[in-house]
UniProtKB/Swiss-Prot annotation:
UniProt-recorded name of the protein: Catalase-peroxidase
Keyword NADP set for record: no
Family of this protein: Belongs to the peroxidase family. Peroxidase/catalase subfamily.
Cofactor note: Binds 1 heme b (iron(II)-protoporphyrin IX) group per dimer.
Cofactor names: heme b
Provenance organism: Allorhizobium ampelinum (strain ATCC BAA-846 / DSM 112012 / S4) (Agrobacterium vitis (strain S4))
Transmembrane segments annotated in the record for this chain: none
InterPro entries assigned to the protein according to its UniProt record, in alphabetical order: Catalase_peroxidase, Haem_peroxidase, Haem_peroxidase_sf, Peroxidases_AS, Peroxidases_heam-ligand_BS
PROSITE patterns to which the protein is assigned, alphabetical: PEROXIDASE_1 (PS00435), PEROXIDASE_2 (PS00436), PEROXIDASE_4 (PS50873)
This protein's encoding gene: katG
GO cellular component: cytosol
NCBIfam families: cat_per_HPI, PRK15061.1
Site (Transition state stabilizer): 94
Cross-link (Tryptophyl-tyrosyl-methioninium (Trp-Tyr) (with M-245)): 97-219
Length: 727
């Protein structure tokens, strides 16, 4: 076969570094708004096709047979990557933990929900070193069970089985994590080097929305902050990072101690002898990274990071040895063979087994971050309680592990499988099931008529429905209109929701709800959650009619109302918008530009660029949110394309307003008359070439009917974003 490569031409598709492919738009204009990010998870990249239903496939899985195969794998040590202590349990616990542990509550991104550990950058993070071996060990099982188990589910289930095979009783397991087929572009930090920490400002203030202390770590540096072996300083980092993963102090202690009851770390030799990570490896390495030149490169010679620590006397069995060792010994600072800071027990006898030589014993060892659980006052109190009450420790770890591995799955309606726990947990954002007949088309029409006759304005109806539904995050499937939590703390008090106006609208709607429900003889009811969305639909229909179009906004009942007791106020405050560009709202504390916040919010709502564009145009003329800017129409509360027509009108000249950052005024080019005011978010649709192209479509004279149709479709998508029962 002739393998000669012609060098005279170049492939027209961009590959490789900038020097090989030429400079892209973002290279020339690094501050350019990235709209393409809205078109990730494109179905074109999915080999399964549009009709594939993963949850349905999972239900066909021989679940017990799969678990049996996983149990057998735990002790089936392979020559190419031998199991520590003859058991892969510790490796697979770490794999599952690191799959889930990227979750961050600030924006709901990261986590185990899509199997992203298979892709860059996560597959090549320093903290994920040698987890490529864990995934390769799983491949024969994944190959056997095929599409009935996703990689995302398999990672977590394998972690559960690992715990069970080592004598621990887990809280349960839910399947339902469908794989994605390309790496998700996320902001993991500003650094350009592994383990960089430019993410801090001031007195060690970690930038939002980040949840780890250094680039390429899951949480904290196990040697201490920037390698400083100070357990108290490390405790601060631990508390910060674990809280950003939605864990409190008790859950944090349970997770660290529970995870470190098993397995070991690997720092057998000089880290400079480790080869490239998977994404930087040679073609013939076939995606395996971190090839080591130290000794055999595996087994007793394994180098994964710096420390060389085995925490307990029974690293393949559940025990309370972690806490017993932590408190029964005093600790002195030492270094691993790799030169990393770690701690060894003083005046102790060797009692820790060797991972590969049964004739050897070692001194108990700990990481700096382990000692934080003893020397931080709050952590110590919890740790001593767990030391004295092993049953409480086991229960806390089981629950915290379940939360860790399921936090980004959303409500329980998305859970599938025979081991789904029956207990409702408050972090699952519990919504009661429907227990009554639902409204029919005639009821819907009657209720719409009452809403319109109530005197509530289009702006009030649309704003309330949007406020209720737009909290949805496609990242961790939280928020949305279902549950009607807009009426509960904390959402009812958020500034972005205009509490006084919100209370007025909800009072009227609650009156209609009570009147309707009291008048039914067969138990039929409408929830406030449904009525809020229905009222918004009525408002949109009225606005469309005012714009010259008769439309019916689709409405599907079936939402229910959550209680305040089912709502964790602190947890829901994480959903509070710092910016909602759809309502032209901007709070004081920002970590991105307003137009970037627009794209970020659209991405969380799973909107495409055209959907985002049409919603902005419609919501502006309906005066949703902050009406003082961006209402580019002389006919407000009518659903028209005026926003785009007037934004793109060359008779208007825009200029920034002195003393009002991010606010602009549009004046008549000839007379200087003030016509409009707008924000950066408004003007981006005339400035950004891709968004301007979309705005031009909706500003055309022949597009008015399509504009209304597209707005209704995008509106309905947001209203139903959390209706997993409709999928």
């Amino acid at each position: 076969m002739d393998t000669k490569v012609e060098t005279g031409g170049k492939c027209p598709v961009a590959h490789g570094p900038a020097g090989a492919k030429g400079r892209g738009n973002r290279d020339w204009w690094p501050e350019q708004l990235d709209v393409q990010i809205l078109h990730q998870k494109n179905k074109i990249a999915d080999p399964m096709g549009p009709d594939f239903d993963y949850a349905e496939e999972f239900r066909k899985l021989d679940y017990e047979a799969l678990k049996s195969d996983l149990h057998a794998l735990m002790t089936d040590s392979q020559d190419w990557w031998p199991a520590d202590f003859g058991h892969y349990g510790g490796l697979f616990v770490r794999m599952a933990w690191h799959s889930a542990g990227t979750y961050r509550i600030t924006d709901g991104r990261g986590g185990a929900g899509a199997g992203q550990q298979r892709f860059a950058p996560l597959n090549s993070w320093p903290d994920n070193a040698n987890l490529d071996k864990a995934r390769r060990l799983l491949w024969p099982i994944k190959q056997k069970y095929g599409n009935k188990i996703s990689w995302a589910d398999l990672f977590i289930l394998t972690g559960n089985v690992a715990l069970e095979s080592m004598g621990f009783k887990t809280f349960g397991f839910a399947g339902g994590r469908a794989d994605t087929w390309e790496p998700e572009e996320l902001f993991w930090g500003p650094e350009g080097t592994w383990l960089g920490d430019e993410r801090y400002s001031g007195e060690r203030q970690l930038s939002e929305p980040l949840g780890a202390v250094q680039m390429g770590l899951i949480y904290v540096n196990p040697e201490g902050p920037n390698g400083n072996p100070d357990p108290i300083a490390a405790a601060r980092d631990i508390r910060e990072t674990f809280s950003r993963m939605a864990m409190n102090d008790e859950e944090t202690v349970a997770l660290i101690a529970g995870g470190h009851t098993f397995g070991k770390t690997h720092g057998a030799g000089d880290p400079s002898l480790i080869g490239a990570e998977p994404e930087g490896g040679a073609l013939e390495d076939q995606g395996l990274g971190w090839k080591s030149k130290f000794g055999t490169g595996f087994g007793a010679d394994t180098i994964t990071g710096g420390p060389e620590v085995t925490w307990t006397q029974t690293p393949t069995r559940w025990s309370n040895f972690f806490f017993e060792n932590l408190f029964n010994f005093e600790w002195e600072l030492t270094k691993s063979p790799a030169g990393a800071h770690q701690w060894k027990a003083k005046n102790a006898e060797p009692s820790i087994p060797d991972a590969h030589d049964p004739s050897k014993k070692h001194l108990p060892t700990m990481l700096t971050t382990d000692l934080s659980l003893r020397f931080d006052p709050a952590y110590e109190k919890i740790s001593r309680r767990f030391l004295e009450n092993p049953d409480q420790f086991a229960d806390a770890f089981a629950r915290a592990w379940f939360k860790l591995t399921h936090r980004d799955m959303g409500p329980k309606v998305r859970y599938v499988g025979p081991e789904v726990p029956s207990e409702d947990l408050i972090w699952q954002d519990v919504i009661p099931p429907v227990d009554h007949p639902l409204v029919d088309d005639r009821d819907v029409a009657d209720l719409k008529a009452k809403v319109i006759a109530s005197g509530l304005s289009v702006q009030e109806l649309v704003s309330t429905a949007w406020a209720s539904a737009s909290t949805f995050r496609g990242s961790d499937k939280r928020g949305g209109a279902n549950g009607a939590r807009i009426r509960l703390a904390p959402q009812k008090d958020w500034d972005v929701n205009h509490p006084a106006q919100l209370a007025k609208v909800l009072s009227v709607l609650e009156g209609f709800q009570q009147e309707f429900n009291a008048g039914q003889s067969a138990g039929k009811k409408i929830s406030l959650a449904d009525l809020i969305v229905l009222a918004g639909a009525a408002g949109v229909e009225k606005a469309a009619k005012a714009g010259g179009h008769d439309v019916t906004v689709p409405f599907t009942p079936g939402r229910t109302d959550a209680s305040q007791e089912q709502t964790d106020v602190a947890s829901f405050n994480a959903l509070k918008p710092r910016a909602d560009a759809f309502r032209n709202y901007l709070s004081g504390h920002q970590f991105m530009k307003p137009e970037e916040a627009l794209v970020d919010r659209a991405r969380l709502l799973t909107l495409t660029a055209p959907e985002m564009t049409v919603l902005i145009g419609g919501l502006r003329v309906l005066k949703a949110g902050q009406p003082e800017h961006g209402v580019l129409t002389r006919n407000p509360e009518a659903l028209t394309n005026d926003f785009f027509v007037n934004l793109l009108d060359m008779r208007t000249q825009w200029a920034p307003v002195a003393g009002k950052e991010g606010v602009y005024e549009g004046r008549d080019r000839k007379s200087g008359e003030l016509l409009w005011t707008g924000t950066r978010v408004d003007l981006i649709f005339g400035s950004h070439s891709q968004l301007r192209a979309l705005a031009e479509v909706y500003a055309q004279s022949d597009i008015k009917e399509k504009f209304v149709k597209d707005f209704v479709a995008a509106w309905t998508k947001v209203m139903n974003a959390d209706r997993f029962d409709l999928v």
